[in-house]
Design a protein with these regions (language model features):
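EAL-type cyclic di-GMP phosphodiesterase domain
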Residues: 56-81, 108-114, 126-161, 190-207
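Bacterial c-di-GMP phosphodiesterase EAL domain
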Residues: 2-127
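Short, well-ordered coil/turn segments that N-cap beta-strands
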Residues: 98-102, 129-134, 160-162, 184, ...
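Distinct, well-ordered alpha-helical segments
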Residues: 112-125, 145-153, 173-185, 229
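Sensor-1/coupling segment of RecA-like P-loop NTPase cores
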Residues: 161-171
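EAL-family c-di-GMP phosphodiesterase catalytic domain
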Residues: 1-29, 33-35, 41, 53-54, ...
Length: 256
């Protein structure tokens, strides 16, 4: 799978940043940063949130660069691959009750892309036990309007993954279309740091209450902000300063 993804990425180098990130990918320098998602009231860890990082200390997000659309898709698929490998490691090393289900942010468009369709099919066929502990956290806006394609995809994910989340941000125009696909959880990518941001959050808060969604507060930066999210009804949270992401690297990946 690793060699397949590297081969796919090399075909889609367009920008200088594409080349930079590809070189890191090829040399196994792209890692997952793992961050706890906690229960809002108890603080107990319920899930692990995984994003891609690279650099000497794994401090740089790969998505901070100017990447072509297809290279971003390749990285999304690579992120899913790393989640499968981490989950497989847990299955082999720990008792089933101790396994942490892992949340992977991924663009809907990456999974509707022809190579993404193939990758998902291979994942379900050959890595089903690991995929059962993965939670795709889907990112989309305009694509949500293509209800038939997205419905087919979400049905497949619900049947094979642990559960299905959707991400909602204040920048999204079509976030209410998420309701068409009955997500198990909503992950909010918003902040409450100033009056303008809190005002932008109101339509999303109304949307969540209307559909009685269980939701995760992301980007929580302080105890004060966490308390606000608790009052607003958040069931889970992540991003708090006490949970600095830890980079994970599996040097044996290139053997696959």
């Amino acid at each position: 799978m690793y060699e397949h993804l590297v081969g796919l990425a090399v075909q889609h180098i367009v920008t200088d940043d594409d080349q930079l990130v590809f070189d890191a990918l090829k040399h196994n320098d792209v890692q997952h940063a793992c961050q706890a998602i906690r229960e809002a009231q108890s603080g107990e860890v319920e899930f692990q949130h995984l994003t891609l990082r690279f650099g000497m200390r794994g401090e740089q997000s790969v998505y901070q660069f100017k990447l072509s659309e297809q290279m971003q898709y390749c990285l999304d698929l690579f992120s899913l691959y790393l989640a499968l490998r981490q989950t497989q490691f847990q299955l082999e090393a720990f008792h089933h009750d101790l396994i942490s289900n892992v949340v992977v942010p991924i663009r809907v468009d990456a999974l509707l892309w022809e190579p993404g369709v193939y990758f998902l099919e291979q994942t379900i066929q050959f890595h089903s036990s690991a995929f059962q502990h993965v939670i795709p956290s889907l990112q989309a806006d305009e694509t949500l309007c293509d209800s038939d394609k997205v419905a087919t995809l979400t049905k497949k994910l619900k049947e094979n993954a642990y559960s299905l989340w959707f991400e909602v941000a204040t920048s999204q125009v079509n976030f209410e279309r998420v309701a068409d696909f009955s997500p198990d959880m909503i992950k909010l990518s918003v902040t409450l740091e100033d009056k303008e941001e809190r005002h932008a959050f109101l339509p999303i808060a109304k949307f969540s209450r209307k559909h009685k969604y269980t939701w995760v507060a992301g980007r929580v930066a302080s105890q004060t902000e966490l308390n606000r999210y608790r009052l607003l009804g958040a069931s889970y949270y992540f991003g708090y300063f006490s949970d600095i992401p830890t980079s994970l690297s599996f040097q044996s990946f290139d053997e696959e």
